Amino acid sequence: MTTQLQPVVTVTPPLPTRRNAELLLLGFAAVITVAALAIVEANQERNFRWYLAGYGLIFWSLFASAHLAIRRFAPYTDPLLLPIVALLNGLGLVMIHRLDLVDNDVTGHHHTSAAQQMLWTLVGVAAFVLVMTVLKDHRQLARYGYISGLTGLVFLAIPAPLPEQNGAKIWIRFPGFSIQPAEFSKILLLIFFAAVLVAKRSLFTSAGKHLIGMTLPRPRDLAPLLAAWVISVSVMVFEKDLGTSLLLYASFLVVVYLATQRLSWVIIGLVLFTAGSTIAYFTFEHIRVRMQVWWDPFTNLDVGGYQIVQSLFSFATGGIFGTGLGNGQPDAIPAASTDFIIAVFGEELGLVGLAALLMLYTIVIVRGLRTAIATRDSFGKLLAAGLASTLAIQLFIVSGGVTTLIPLTGLTTPWMSYGGSSLLANYVLLAILARISHSARHPLRSRPHNTSPIAVASTEVIERV
C-alpha cells in the first residue's frame, strides 16, 4: 500500500477579533457623552431639551458605521482605538456646545459651533470609513513615499504667501470655511519619513567617528537631518507657526531614532534646533515676543499673555475635582474652544477629570506603540510608531503650552478642539493606525511544506520467509 504525502499547513492560533467588545464600548462612550450633555444642560439651562438626545443617537450611529467598516474590512483592529476616540470626540462636542451656550448669553446671538463640529465629525468618520475601505494593506503607502513627502511640503508652503491671520500664516480661506493644510502635512511627511528610512536605512546607520560612547553619523549622511531642520525653522520663521515646526521636527527625530537606535541622531538634531531657535529669537520679533510671554505672561498681557493668565486661573479655580460641567467661567478664556479647551476641562472637571482625559490619550498612544511592536514589516513598525509618537508629542505641546511648561504654540487637542482640519486629519491618522493594527493582529498563515516520508509512512509487518 502506498501512502500519499499531504502538505502540512501551520496556522498561528487566531486572536479573538473583539468586535462585540468594541461595539459595547462605543455604546458606553455614547452614554457618557449624552450624560455629560444632560449635566451641561441642567446647569446652564435648568432643563433638558429632549431633542438633544437625538444628537446622541446620531453620534452613536456615526461611530456604529465606523465599527461596521472595521468589522467588514479590518476585523482584527485593536478594539480600544475607536471607542476611546469616540469618547474624546463626544466630550469635545459637549464642551463646544457648553461654550456656545455661554456665548449666546453674553452676545445675544445664536452660536452654532457645536453643530459645525458635528458636521466635521461626520466628514471625519466618513474619511475614516473611506480609508479603511480603500487601503487594503498599509504597505501600499510605502510606494508613494516620495509623492507623499512632496505633497506634504507643498501643503506646508501654500499658506506662506497668504495674509496672516491670528498671528500666523497657517490658514487657507474659502467661501464659508477654511482649512489648515499643515494638519495633513504631518501624516504625509510621516509616510515619507518611514518609507525613506526603510529604503535608505544604510544611509542612516553608516558608522562614523566615535565620541563619548556614541557613534556619530558621517558628515555626508547628515543631509536628511539638515533638510528637516531647514523645513522646521522655515515654518517657524516665515509662517510664524511654532507648533507645527516643533511637531514635525520632533516626529522626525523620533522616527530616525527608532529606525537607527542611535542617540547621536537625536542629540545632533536637538543641537541644530536649539541653534536655529536661538538665531530666530535674536532675529525675528514675533519669536522674541512669544518667548517673553512664556517667561512672564503677567507682565505681557497686551501681547498674548492674557489668555495664558486666564488659563492658569482656570486650572486654579478647578482645583482637584473641578467646578462641575456647566458651572465654570470658560468665557474668560480667549480661544477656549480651540487652543485652550484643556484649560476649560481643567476648570470644570478638575485635576482628577483632566487626568482621566489624559489617560484616555495615553491608552491610544500605548496601543499604537504596541501595534508598532507587533507589526511584522519595518515600514509598518516605523509608521505606527511615528503616528503614535506624533499624538504624544502634540498632546505634550498643547498641555505644556496652556500650563506654561513650554511656550504656547497654537496647536489643537486631537479630536476634542474645535476645528475641521484637525478633526479630519486625525481621523485619517486613526484609520491608518487601525489598518496597521489589523495587520499586526491578523493570524499569520505559513506556507505549506511537505513532511518527511518517515513521519507519515504507515507501519507494515513483514513476514519472515
From Swiss-Prot:
One of its GO terms (molecular function) is lipid-linked peptidoglycan transporter activity. GO terms for cellular component: cell division site; plasma membrane. The chain crosses the membrane at residues 21-41, 50-70, 76-96, 115-135, 144-164, 179-199, 222-242, 243-263, 264-284, 308-328, 340-360, 382-402, 414-434. Pathway: Cell wall biogenesis; peptidoglycan biosynthesis. It is a multi-pass membrane protein. It comes from the Bacteria. Belongs to the SEDS family. This is Peptidoglycan glycosyltransferase RodA. It comes from Mycobacterium leprae (strain TN). The gene is rodA.
